[in-house]
């Protein structure tokens, strides 16, 4: 139920909010205990999502990053100051690069990476390429089209997607030049 809650809740991810929506079925303390006890890795997210997706060529992959706001946290090591597209400002939080499988009205997260360059030295663009490589090579995802915002519209990413034989849909920043020739 917790994964379903995360998928359907765009704003308030608290244990208390989930418990309120379960009409007393589960207490917020039980949810908190579960989250402290369990270790949800990208692999476990995939195992939960795999039976739910319609793995067809008509599906899409969506790459999007989000920041889990931790403005009051002083001791969580992954918290850093970073730009939030939601607030259009810098916020203290944990950056996550998400990969979502979309088919018709079904949206299922299938992978994610924590954006922590001080830990793994990777950029968000490198995470995008890693997520896509795993999706197509190891998870055997059949989607042909990848959607992402202009943050990921770097030449290296676009060429990588092209080499995969896939299509992309994105917006480009004003200062980007595009060539329609095959050069």
Each model region followed by its residue ranges:
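Gly/serine-rich nucleotide phosphate-binding loop at the start of the catalytic core
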Residues: 1-40
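Hydrophobic, Leu/Ile/Phe/Ala-enriched alpha-helical segments that form helix-helix packing faces
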Residues: 6, 22, 53, 132-139
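Generic hydrophobic, aliphatic-rich segments that mediate packing or membrane embedding
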Residues: 14, 27, 45, 58-61, ...
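A structural signal for short, well-ordered beta-strand segments and their strand-loop junctions
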Residues: 17, 60-63, 109-111, 147, ...
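Electropositive, glycine- and tryptophan-enriched low-complexity nucleic-acid-binding patches
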Residues: 29-33, 84-142
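Active-site-proximal, Lys/Arg-enriched surface segment
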Residues: 35-106
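Short, conserved acidic/polar surface loops in the N-terminal third of protein domains
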Residues: 71-77, 109-112, 158-159, 180-181
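An internal, acidic/charged active-site-proximal segment
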Residues: 114-183
